[in-house]
Amino acid sequence: MEKNLENLTIGVFAKAAGVNVETIRFYQRKGLLPEPDKPYGSIRRYGEADVTRVRFVKSAQRLGFSLDEIAELLRLDDGTHCEEASSLAEHKLQDVREKMTDLARMETVLSELVFACHARQGNVSCPLIASLQGEKEPRGADAV
């Protein structure tokens, strides 16, 4: 890890964690990141553990976890709750698979509509517009 990640101001901390200051404040409001003590007449300081925590949140977001799910994963981060964490990941994996199925269905419908648009001849209404207006449902559109 980078050297000297202790005693950081919020700006330096945000940069080290790869986010902006508003993201830090947002995570604090959401309870994902504790707000450090503010010594009298001083400014709050952050350390390596805070940087690691923000990176954890960002990594989990990239995998599709919601902030509520990330809060739950953080709660489980003592090394003894692997089964609970695995269960959360299994649910997320199922969600991802369902979304992929939906996206594949949408791709098929859109592909058919684009083909129909390119294949139309004469003064026929646009198949895409007609489909969206409900005049003619493309195959599989009711599932989208």
Curated annotation (Swiss-Prot):
Domain HTH merR-type: 7-76
Pfam families documented for this protein: MerR, MerR-DNA-bind
Gene Ontology biological-process entries: response to mercury ion
UniProt keyword list: Activator, DNA-binding, Mercuric resistance, Mercury, Metal-binding, Plasmid, Repressor, Transcription, Transcription regulation
Alphabetical list of CDD domains matching this protein: HTH_MerR1
InterPro entries assigned: DNA-bd_dom_put_sf (IPR009061), MerR (IPR011794), MerR-type_HTH_dom (IPR000551), MerR_fam (IPR047057), Tscrpt_reg_MerR_DNA-bd (IPR015358)
A Gene Ontology molecular function term of the record: DNA binding
DNA-binding residue intervals: 10-29
Binding site for Hg(2+): 82, 117, 126
SMART domains: HTH_MERR
Function: Mediates the mercuric-dependent induction of mercury resistance operon. In the absence of mercury MerR represses transcription by binding tightly to the mer operator region; when mercury is present the dimeric complex binds a single ion and becomes a potent transcriptional activator, while remaining bound to the mer site.
Name listed for the protein in its UniProt record: Mercuric resistance operon regulatory protein
Originating organism: Serratia marcescens
Gene that encodes the chain: merR
